[in-house]
């Protein structure tokens, strides 16, 4: 999947610290730290902290 994120809160610091809080069955392709529950289907979110947000998903 292309890296995209609908919910991406950022801190007001410079540089900002942003985290994608979308939850889905997988994480986006650029995610380095993907955390998933053991449920079926799994609920995964990306734990990476970046200084930007990816474009919104369609």
UniProtKB/Swiss-Prot annotation:
Which top-level group of life is the source organism from?
Eukaryota
**Triggers of expression:** By wounding.
Q: Where is this site: Reactive bond for trypsin?
A: 12-13, 38-39
Q: Does the keyword Disulfide bond apply?
A: yes
InterPro entries according to UniProt: Bowman-Birk_prot_inh, Prot_inh_BBI
Q: SUPFAM superfamilies per the record?
A: Bowman-Birk inhibitor, BBI
Name the family. Answer: Belongs to the Bowman-Birk serine protease inhibitor family.
Q: What is this protein called?
A: Bowman-Birk type wound-induced trypsin inhibitor
**Could you tell me which species this protein originates from?**
Medicago sativa (Alfalfa)
